[in-house]
């Protein structure tokens, strides 16, 4: 069976991962199965936070990482591995901050995803862009991020490129090219290379 690629679209919340994922899905043939963290787990996370007496916007921090995020990412990983094992490419969309900033962790995670071709697409952003985008989308899940914006942006490592091999899509205010142009160039370069 041919290698079913895994595409990982990562970056901070509000960076534009969903937009980039949509552009990739439109350009890739065959189109991969989309595994978006918010779509897969959004309502579950809201219910789990409520059941635990946590605030609805708590999507960062030690408690969330231990009791929620670990299970979200484990479920996404197992689902991706299973889908790929049947020859279907996948596209995972989530921040994946810890996985992309540690080269050995990335290698281990890529193996858990089923090995083979695992491509990281990093959506680059900065504090000004994130603040504008998070404010504009007005989602309750962003409340804690905006309330503790300085700590949130520090935890996202905005100025640190991923330690894992990656392709960058620049979605900062004033980026030199549109997302459409950047994704088109990326897909063309991978097809040629």
Residue ranges, per PLM feature:
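Hydrophobic anchor at the beta1->P-loop junction of P-loop NTPases
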Residues: 9
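Conserved substrate/cofactor phosphate-moiety recognition/catalytic segment
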Residues: 22-74, 81
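Conserved phosphate-donor/acceptor-positioning beta-strand/loop module used by diverse small-molecule
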Residues: 113-135
């Amino acid at each position: 069976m041919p290698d079913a690629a895994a595409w990982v679209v990562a970056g901070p919340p509000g960076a534009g991962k969903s937009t980039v994922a949509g552009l990739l899905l439109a350009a890739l043939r065959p189109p991969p199965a989309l595994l978006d963290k918010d779509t897969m787990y959004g309502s579950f996370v809201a219910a789990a936070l409520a059941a635990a007496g946590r605030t609805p916007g708590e999507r960062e921090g030690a408690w969330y990482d231990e009791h929620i995020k670990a299970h979200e990412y484990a479920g996404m990983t197992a689902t991706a591995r299973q889908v790929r094992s049947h020859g279907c490419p996948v596209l995972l969309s989530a921040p994946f901050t810890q996985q992309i900033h540690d080269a050995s962790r990335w290698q281990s995670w890529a193996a858990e995803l089923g090995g083979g071709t695992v491509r990281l697409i990093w959506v680059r952003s900065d504090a000004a862009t994130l603040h504008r985008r998070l404010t504009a989308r007005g989602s309750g899940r962003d409340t804690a991020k905006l309330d503790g914006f300085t700590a949130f942006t520090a935890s996202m490592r905005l100025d640190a490129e991923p330690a894992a091999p990656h392709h960058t899509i620049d979605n900062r205010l004033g980026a030199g090219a549109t997302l459409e142009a950047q994704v088109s160039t990326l897909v063309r370069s991978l097809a040629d290379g």
